[in-house]
Amino acid sequence: GFKVEVYERRPDPRTTDLYVGKSINLAISVRGLHAMKDVGLEDAVREMCIPMNGRMIHDRQGNTDFQFYSKDGQKAINSISRGDLNILLINTAASFPNVSFHFDHRCVGMDLDTGEALLLNEKTGENLRVSGQTVIACDGAFSGARASLLRSPRFNFSQTYHPASYKELSFRP
């Protein structure tokens, strides 16, 4: 297969408490489980899942209404820890000799003439230029790769911000 190098801004979640109190669980559907099956991880993922048969709607008057996720109430979507899933995926990918991970590296831009990603090692302050046959930039809301594209001539885009804010809820068993 291809040689794959992953550069991640955050620290290695396998050695830090990256997700403690900062992330809500993911809802993984049948489609997501099929994807995990395709890469041989369905059983491991299912062991980490908590089935959710429906949702509870709370109105402003204090009334509640339980709504099943399926018409017959028999099918569930599954809740899974984002951190645990990421660790499983990283460990699985890292088990291949052609895959390597580099944590604490922030993408600060792209050199569109050479196709190189411009990275900053946030631990050492070292600047790196990384190239590959294909560069896939998934560097988030304040993307250095996107900023580089926006500065290029005749690049058209639109950007819309969602007005909602984030609210974390914690329910003790």
Segments (PLM) and residue ranges:
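Conserved SAM-binding loop
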Residues: 6, 25, 137
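Short, intrinsically disordered, charge-balanced linker/junction segments flanking boundaries
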Residues: 170-173
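Conserved N-terminal helical subregion
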Residues: 29-168
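Glycine-rich FAD pyrophosphate-binding loop
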Residues: 1-21
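Short glycine-enriched, charge-decorated loop/helix-capping segments at active-site entrances
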Residues: 18-24, 72-76
